[in-house]
Amino acid sequence: MDVSPPQQLPLEAQQRVCEPTCVLLEVADQPQEQRLGLMQRPALPPLRGMWFPFKPARPLRFWMLNTIAPLDMVFVHQGEVIAIEAEVPICLALPCQSFGPMADADGVIELGTGEAKRLGLGVGDAVVIEPITLKSPKQKVDEIRRSVTGDTLW
């Protein structure tokens, strides 16, 4: 059993589901980050997830070893959902089942269990992953004011 502490990666990207809904994503783009994934992490809140990009595309299989909360896995190839593994159960000891399509994928989004369905994600849907632009505190305050007041003259 892996006793690595859980990793918490910075929110670096977002997935546009349908305007204006975005899922904030931690990006696991290094082999060690991908190996640890969401191990030992509590359940993800709504609109949060982890993005695992892979180059080149290839058949990807994920398992849930030491993942303590069930997840949805959204497999992506060239900006399109190619498979969804919903409500994947936890696995605390080997052997663990692996999940994924037999087709090439260039990324996987892990979401809290039931989140893919709640968001209405389906096979064939477009997936847009974009970096989060860092904003100054003033820009954040102005954005909140605009969202509350509807005023575009800030």
Predicted regions and their residues:
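Compact, glycine-rich, soluble single-domain proteins
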Residues: 1-154
